[in-house]
C-alpha cells in the first residue's frame, strides 16, 4: 500500500506580495497550465497513489481552499495542524493518522509548491525510491542533481554507492548541510558529491515512527497519546493539546541528520522549488531584453527584470536586474539578486502591525 502526504501549510513568504497568508504560494497558478501548485503536485503522482490515499497536511485557514481545489478528496484526508510546529511535528502527526487508516503502508512525503517538468521521469524515481524504502527500515530522500552553484537550497552530501535499480544509483547519505554561501556552493558543485535537498522523502510508516521514537522521544510520547485517542470524542482535543507540546524542529534537523540508514537517489527531472521571484525566469517566457513580464509593461533600456502587474500598466526607464510586483494593496520593488530577502521585508511589515498586507 502506497500513501502520500502533501505538506501544504506554508505561507510562501518569499513570493510576497502575491503569496499571502490567506492565499499562499501553493494555491497560486505560477505555471502556464492554469493549475495551482497543489493541484499539479497531486496530479503528478496519481498513477502511483489514488486520491483516496493522498493526505494533505495544512492549517485550519486553508481547509476550504484545499477542498475546492482537490474535488473528491475525502475530508478526513485533510490533516489540520493546530498551530505551527515545523515539519517534524507535521510529519509525525500525519504518520499517526495515516497509519491508523492504512496500517503498514509506505508513505511518500512531498511539498505542495514545487515545479516538476518531467513527470514521467519523476514518477520513475519515485517508484525506485519506494522499492528502496521497502527493503528495510531505511529512510529515503530524493536529491536533485545541481546545475549551478545555488545558495537558496540546502545540500545532501552523499557517500558510497549501495546499489542500482534499473540504472539509477542509490547512495548512502553522509550528512545534510544548510544553505551555503556562494563560494561554498561552487565547491559543492565542483566536488560532485553534493545534491540539492528537495524536501521529498519516502519511507515505511513504521520506519519514520521508529526514528521519531529514537531521536525525538518526547514528540513520540505525544504522538502515542494522539494515536490512542483517534476515533474517540476526545481526538481533536488530544491532538491540539499534544501538538502544542511538540518541539518545533524540521524533519531534516530532528531526524534525517541523526538517523542511521539514510539513502538518497539522485534525480534530474526539471525540478524547481520556485523559492523566490527570480525562479519565474526558469518557468515563464523571457523576452528579447531578458525580462519576464506578466501584465502590461512598457520600458526603455529595461533588461533582465521580472515585472508582475496584471492590473496596471508599468513603465520603466534604465533598470536592470530588478523585481517589480504590483498587487491591489502592496508593491514590491527590489534588486533581483536580493529577492531572497523578501521574507525579511515581510517580517518588518508584520512587526509594524500591517497584517492586512500580509
List each language-model region with its residue ranges.
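Conserved N-terminal catalytic core of the sugar/cofactor nucleotidyltransferase
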Residues: 1-6, 14-21, 32-111, 115-127, ...
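Left-handed beta-helix
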Residues: 205-358
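A residue-level structural signature of the nucleotidyltransferase/glycosyltransferase Rossmann-like core
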Residues: 107, 193, 200-201, 272, ...
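A short acidic, often aromatic-flanked loop/helix-cap motif at beta-alpha or helix-coil junctions
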Residues: 84-89, 148-150, 182-184, 271-272
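Residue-level signal for inorganic ion chemistry
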Residues: 38, 94, 113, 156, ...
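Conserved core of the sugar-phosphate nucleotidyltransferase
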Residues: 119-240, 263, 336
Amino acid at each position: 500500500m502506497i500513501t502520500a502526504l502533501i505538506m501544504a501549510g506554508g505561507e510562501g513568504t518569499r513570493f510576497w506580495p502575491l503569496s499571502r497568508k490567506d492565499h499562499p504560494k501553493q494555491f497560486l497558478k505560477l505555471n502556464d497550465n492554469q493549475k495551482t501548485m497543489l493541484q499539479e503536485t497531486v496530479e503528478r503522482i496519481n498513477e502511483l497513489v489514488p486520491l483516496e490515499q493522498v493526505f494533505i497536511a495544512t492549517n485550519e485557514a486553508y481547509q476550504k481552499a484545499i477542498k475546492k481545489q482537490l474535488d473528491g478528496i475525502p475530508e478526513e484526508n485533510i490533516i489540520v495542524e493546530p498551530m505551527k510546529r515545523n515539519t517534524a511535528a507535521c510529519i509525525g502527526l500525519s504518520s499517526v493518522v495515516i497509519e491508523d487508516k492504512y496500517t503498514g503502508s509506505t508513505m511518500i512525503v512531498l511539498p505542495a509548491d514545487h515545479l516538476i517538468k518531467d513527470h514521467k521521469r519523476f514518477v520513475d524515481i519515485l517508484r525506485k525510491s519506494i522499492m528502496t524504502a521497502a527493503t528495510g527500515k531505511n529512510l529515503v530522500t530524493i536529491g536533485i542533481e545541481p546545475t549551478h552553484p545555488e545558495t537558496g537550497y540546502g545540500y545532501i552530501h552523499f557517500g558510497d554507492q549501495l546499489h542500482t535499480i534499473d540504472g539509477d544509483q542509490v547512495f548512502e547519505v553522509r550528512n545534510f548541510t544548510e544553505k551555503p554561501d556562494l563560494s561554498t556552493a561552487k565547491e559543492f558543485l565542483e566536488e560532485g558529491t553534493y545534491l540539492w535537498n528537495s524536501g521529498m522523502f519516502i519511507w515505511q510508516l513504521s520506519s519514520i515512527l521508529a526514528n521519531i521514537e529514537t531521536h525525538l522521544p518526547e514528540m513520540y510520547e505525544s504522538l502515542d497519546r494522539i494515536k490512542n485517542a483517534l476515533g474517540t470524542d476526545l481526538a481533536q482535543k488530544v491532538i491540539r493539546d499534544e501538538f502544542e507540546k511538540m518541539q518545533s524542529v524540521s524533519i531534516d534537523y530532528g531526524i534525517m541528520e541523526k538517523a542511521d540508514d539514510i539513502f538518497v537517489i539522485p534525480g534530474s527531472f526539471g525540478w524547481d522549488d520556485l523559492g523566490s521571484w527570480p525562479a519565474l525566469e526558469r518557468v515563464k517566457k523571457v523576452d528579447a531584453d531578458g525580462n519576464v513580464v506578466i501584465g502590461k509593461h512598457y520600458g526603455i533600456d529595461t533588461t533582465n527584470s521580472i515585472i508582475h502587474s496584471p492590473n496596471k500598466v508599468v513603465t520603466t526607464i534604465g533598470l536592470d536586474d530588478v523585481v517589480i510586483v504590483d498587487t491591489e494593496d502592496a508593491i514590491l520593488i527590489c534588486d533581483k539578486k536580493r529577492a531572497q530577502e523578501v521574507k525579511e521585508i515581510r517580517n518588518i511589515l508584520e512587526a509594524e502591525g500591517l497584517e492586512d498586507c500580509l
